[in-house]
């Protein structure tokens, strides 16, 4: 919206390191705190591939995305502390901004010792709805363990690939994911369901995936 121009970096990204941005974010989070009983909040921040390359670049010059995301997250975490909220974000920006590949493209035994890392009280949510092999989950959880000891996993109940749910993919991916999460002692997992590709599948069709998640959490 035109009214947001002053705090826009690019079409779908807020401009970091701008006080008006953090004033806006604090108002958003204050509203969340007032209207929900939980003190936990998922801040999103995923797939911001153009971070720092829009108005931020024009006003400040080039800065590495890994530095921008770390400093921005630190500011937002400070706001969450002020409001007594416990935040989490999708983890992909901490991986893609620190490397040259895609989220899942890093080689095994990747060394993250020189990467920019989040504050300890910011949960990193590793999201993966795609892989049915435990090796990928092991690789990704090894990488996440180097970034944070506050790691959460998010899988999915597949209702977003057409007019019917994809239960076979839900089963294969969830079985591989949750068995690996147990091996790595991940304490918290989420089951997501998205509305991509026209949202043609009835939402209630996600329920078998939720039951599978619940079953595999304990068996």
What are the language-model segments listed below?
Residues 1-5, 206:
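Short, flexible, mixed-charge acidic loops at enzyme active sites
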Residues 11-17, 60-65:
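Second-shell loop/turn segments in exported
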Residues 22-34, 38-40, 47, 58-219:
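Substrate-binding groove of N-acetylhexosamine-processing glycoside hydrolases
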Residues 7-14, 50, 131, 158-160:
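Conserved radical SAM core fold
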Residues 1, 49-55:
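Short acidic/His/Gly/Ser-rich catalytic and metal-binding motifs that mark active-site loops
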Residues 1, 14-17, 31, 144:
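Generic low-polarity alpha-helical segments
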